Amino acid sequence: MGTCVVRGRWRAVGGAVFRVLAVWAVSTLTMLILAGLLPDFRIQSPSGDSPTTIARTAAIGAGAFGLLSALVWPLLVRALLLVPAFFLGVLVFFLNGSMLLLALRLVPDGGSEAGPETAVAVAAIMSAVASATSTALAVRDDGAYRRRLRRLAHRHRPGPRRTGEDGLPARPGILFLQLDGVGFDVLSEAVSPRTLPGTGRVLPPVMETVASWIESGGHRLSMWRTDWSSQTGASQLGILHGTNHDVPAFRWYEKETGRVLVCSSPSSVAELQRRAVERTGDRGLLAEDGASRGNLFSGGAQQLALVLSVAARRGRGIRSRAGYFAYFSDPANATRTALSFTAEVFREIVQAVRARMRGDEPRVKRGGLYPFIRAFATVVSRDVVVAAVIGDLFAGRTVVYADLVAYDEVAHHSGPHSRDAQQVLARLDRSVRLIAKAAAHAPRAYRIVLLSDHGQSPGRTFAEAYGITLEELVRIGCRGGRSGSRPLAGRRADREVTGAEARAVARAALHRVDEEEKETRRGRGAGPVVLGSGNLGLISFPELPGRVSREEIERRHPALLGTLAEHPGIGFVLVRSEEYGPVVLGPHGGEHRLDQRVVIGPDPLAPFGPEAEDAVRRTAAFPHAADIMVNSAYDPTTGRVHAFEAQIGSHGGLGGSQGHAFLLRPAELSPPVPEGEILTGAEAVHRVFRRWLAETEAPGAPLSPPAGGPGERVG
């Protein structure tokens, strides 16, 4: 047996040496070809050299570049943790080119030279070729492939291991992978075969890997219903920390402090997490050997990467950005992501121009910084989170929760069912496949749970559909009142042009952690504060303490509530009555008294389904519910709503697919709810996940799901 072990080690060493030599040879050949093609790149003296000398120079230069990439690059990236990560993609090219120039100076002949711009291009090409060669060689060897994935993730020190009699972990781990904003309807379409219009040709599903899991019976798909505030802040806080009490919207005004809390501000989400932990007395879902990757909240995990709630604290903020180092310390990864980032920027510009030329409707502006925000969400954030998750799998962590925000960002501006969004889903499917392959090589079995935090509902913006913003509508309603005050903040909400989750990650990467909160901070006595959270609007009167009653609003602004409730773009209005408690007002004099369960006239909540009553009643009891809460109109036949932000795919309120998230669980886990029932509320999802974690205590759990689609060989 000892002889077999020795032979195996020598075989591994021999294979590693062969791969190093092969990559070196390919890099040398690449340098020779580029020297022949690029006029500003020379690896011979001006007087000319023999072919042997040129080849030797190329080999030395390629070898020096490879050594510098392996030894110096990780140190540079660690230093760059002090630099805003958003600029890392630009610095990648400059630093890579600088290392190539240094490598050429190390060549003894001294005849090699390259212009700065040429050095950047040559370094990028050589890094990409070396990475592709190394990957191609490693794919043929399971051991090498496993080591390749480990290097991809640059895993940290492994967490605690629990071993059984056979030396393997006695309990499987669980990976919760959140596909941000992918509604139940969107996922159902993405895992179904498609028919090419006009030809009848059947195409494979957009998400082939996920479809294969369902088709094989290894996973079961179900829907879960969100709270009224159908957005990541409320959903993820409830899922990770067990409560989303007093989170009425994506952004809301708190009178006692004069602040607007926003679920994309690090200081705001840190405060929400503190309140949740204080309320539950529990650190969170991930407290036991867990990892939180790309999320708004930590979930109590000690292993963090791109977690917004710790970004406001500089000391831990640097630590939370260690995920950047874990990925970008490989120069090939850095180059590939930087190139993909650039390509994604141009892809968005081209897609936006095409949409305008086709006259697509509805449509929102997609200029300014948006192409860069989209590229950050669909490339940088995705790559870093996926690498961190793979590192967690190889570290054998007990539970991992990660969020991929790419789809949500694109769907906001291109539409939930657009071709642009489908392309993002296909790329997310490839990320899921890569993670599943890594799980197959991990030191413990893993159960992979896919879920979303909400869906998205399509529709023209409120401003586009009716030629007026919510802020302007409130102003009209206030004109007949005694105060004659003018709202402050509604225009800002209507001008919002970027997806909240992606913008939050990008802001943290730029170290602009509190800019949005500073912009939305308002003093007392300045008139109503009007905010938009998707198709949910909030109106607060800062000069009046506590929750202002319906009767007081009607005394001060007699026309306001009627103006809002009777507008065709408004579905219903929630206020608090001194006599009846929470009351929902709607068109044609409709009124729904929630505490008494009494409806007068047409029920304003009827178009939103039977579950709307409980959802609105729960939010009405929140201490920081706005004085007036407004939900846009909803068309049940088309599923369309009207966002109070510049988004044609929106979420945050009631109406349509935005409130229908999905849950895809391994068949071995117990059903989330009894058959015929629908899981409702993020807090209920937390309880289900707790139960599933308890179920994994039993030994002998099945292995992770297969990584590929039908017919794909795994392992």
Which residue stretches match the model-derived regions?
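Active-site neighborhoods of enzymes that stabilize oxyanions during catalysis
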Residues: 264-271, 275-282, 286-289, 293-300, ...
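A long, amphipathic alpha-helix that forms part
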Residues: 379-380, 384, 392, 400, ...
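Active-site nucleophile/metal-coordination loop of metallo-enzymes that catalyze phosphate/sulfate
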Residues: 170, 184-325, 329-333, 482-542, ...
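Acidic, His- and aromatic-enriched active-site or binding-groove loops in soluble protein domains
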Residues: 241-254, 318-321, 422-430, 467-486, ...
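Juxtamembrane/disordered regions of integral membrane proteins
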Residues: 1-121, 132-137, 141
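Metal-dependent active-site segment of extracytoplasmic phospho-/sulfohydrolases and closely related
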Residues: 429-466, 583-585
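Short, highly charged, low-complexity non-transmembrane loops/tails of multi-pass membrane proteins
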Residues: 141-160
